[in-house]
A protein has these predicted regions:
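Accessory nucleic acid-recognition modules appended to NTPase machines
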Residues: 183-232
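Short beta-strand element(s) in the Bergerat
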Residues: 46-48, 152
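Mobile ATP-lid/nucleotide-binding loop of the nucleotide-binding subdomain
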Residues: 67-70
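Bergerat-fold GHKL ATPase/HATPase_c domain
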Residues: 1-34, 39, 44, 60-63, ...
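Acidic ATP/Mg2+-coordinating residue in the GHKL
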Residues: 52
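Charged regulatory segments coupled to nucleotide-binding catalytic modules in large multidomain enzymes
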Residues: 176, 216-437
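GHKL-type ATPase core
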Residues: 75-191, 195-199
Length: 437
């Protein structure tokens, strides 16, 4: 068959670097790994590799794993199984590089095979290379694999896509690796307690998009179970604390976002692995007042076809037949989010001299503040007229709706006065009093 066309098709599935890395990690978790290490080097012979201490593969198992659409008939649909079509290893790897190698240790022996698109393009045949011992020993991080009783090492090389698109390969490569680390932290956050994932020897940070440990501040809605064709979908609504009240530790658990607005909505999980997030999936719920609501939806792998999970395992579509059932579970969290957003529980600091004064009339005049009074008395008639025009524009065109939305979405209190220096305040008061005298 036309191997060149097949491999070209696998490369075009649409992985990002981060989603491709996540697909390789899926295989490690499916192999019951308790430790996963990521290593990379962008210099003379660039490589990216994922090493795990999973169950490893025999020669026959490795040969099957390297085939596009590998046989998955022996794979159990259990919580630890994250595979889908038998394409992930090949499609994810080839989406990022022209050559990838898999070395695996089982029964005390390391075996390795590789695909090189340069060779396949030339021969137009699906040529799978079996590495000899010398070639195996030359693989990056192979000594780490040798130390495990069992395990697997996936190595990417020949990064043609990055080379063709990047102004500076080294900078782009390092950036993509750093982005994949953040992506990994979120996508596999529910495995943090059971599986240790390292990037260059440093364990990834803990993430929690729901702040489940913020007892008394975060609110958890009622857990709902939806039966679909005998399989159970679990829905748990969460309402985060108001943005202005988040502690540094909570911000870190959320990934230190610039805004929590874009992270509202459904968090879809397949076997505890995060598939998609930050969207209401066209259910018409997204709004400023709902931004604190996050809905955990656990989908069993038995319902993959119902949810139309894609090859990359990075998106899914909510079926119409269960939309209404899920929306009922969502409503409680949305109500809580609106209540929390309207009443954030954070007061503005009291100040001695207010630039803005809250009054019942709609004209919002600010003429009576001490600094404006002093300035008005110090000016001549022509300057007073210009000041009057400027103040009128400020009073009439206050962007109150933009201020409301921006302040509700801010992670800190805007112009709270907390950073106002005492010395600066004293100097301004003295200047005003001098004019008043």
């Amino acid at each position: 068959f036309p191997a060149k066309a097949l491999m070209t098709g696998l490369r075009a599935i649409g992985y990002s670097f981060s989603s491709a890395v996540a697909d390789i990690i899926d295989n490690s978790i499916s192999a019951n790994a308790s430790e996963i290490n990521i290593f990379s080097d962008p210099l003379s012979d660039p490589y990216f590799c994922v090493l795990d201490n999973g169950c490893g593969m025999s020669a026959k198992e490795l040969d099957n794993a390297m085939l596009p659409g590998s046989d998955r008939s022996g794979k159990a649909e259990c919580e630890q199984e994250l595979g889908r079509f038998g394409l992930g290893l090949k499609s994810a790897s080839l989406s990022q590089c022209r050559e990838f190698t898999v070395a695996s240790k089982k029964f005390g022996k390391i075996r390795a095979m590789s695909f090189d698109l340069d060779v396949i393009d030339k021969e137009n045949r699906l040529l799978l290379k079996v590495l000899n011992s010398e070639e195996i020993n030359a693989l990056p991080s192979i000594h780490n694999l040798a130390e495990y009783e069992t395990g697997t090492l996936v190595v990417w090389t020949k990064f043609d896509k990055i080379e063709n698109l990047a102004k500076n390969f080294e900078d782009s490569f390092r950036r993509l690796v750093a982005e994949s680390k953040k992506h990994t932290e979120l996508v596999f956050h529910r495995y943090y307690k059971t599986i240790q994932i390292y990037y260059h020897g440093k364990r990834i940070e803990k993430r929690d998009p729901f702040l489940v440990d913020s007892i008394g501040r975060q609110q958890t809605g009622r857990k709902s179970e939806i039966n679909v064709d005998g399989a159970i979908i679990t829905v748990i609504p969460y309402t985060l604390p108001f943005a202005n009240t988040l502690t540094p530790e909570e911000k870190a658990l959320l990934g230190n976002p610039k805004s929590i607005y874009d992270e509202q909505g459904f968090y879809l999980y397949r076997n505890r692995r995060l598939i998609s997030w930050g969207s209401w999936m066209h259910m018409g719920i997204r709004s400023e007042l709902n931004k604190l609501a996050r809905i955990q939806v656990d989908i069993p792998s038995a319902l993959d076809s119902v949810w139309m999970l894609d090859v990359k395992k990075s998106s899914a579509k909510i079926p119409d037949k269960i939309k209404d059932m899920i929306k009922m579970a969502v409503d409680d969290s949305v109500i809580r989010s609106k209540r929390t957003t309207r009443f954030p529980g954070t007061k503005e600091q009291s100040v001695a001299f207010k630039v803005w004064d809250r009054i019942n009339e709609h004209d919002g005049k600010i003429r009576d503040t001490p600094s404006i009074v002093a300035l008005n008395e110090a000016l001549g008639q022509a300057e007073k007229k210009l000041l009057d025009i400027a103040l009128s524009q400020i009073e009439c065109y206050l962007p109150k709706y933009s201020i409301t939305n921006d302040s509700m979405d801010a992670l800190t209190i805007i112009n709270s006065g907390a950073d106002y220096e005492d010395e600066q305040l004293i100097q301004e008061i003295e200047a005003i009093l001098a004019f008043c005298d």
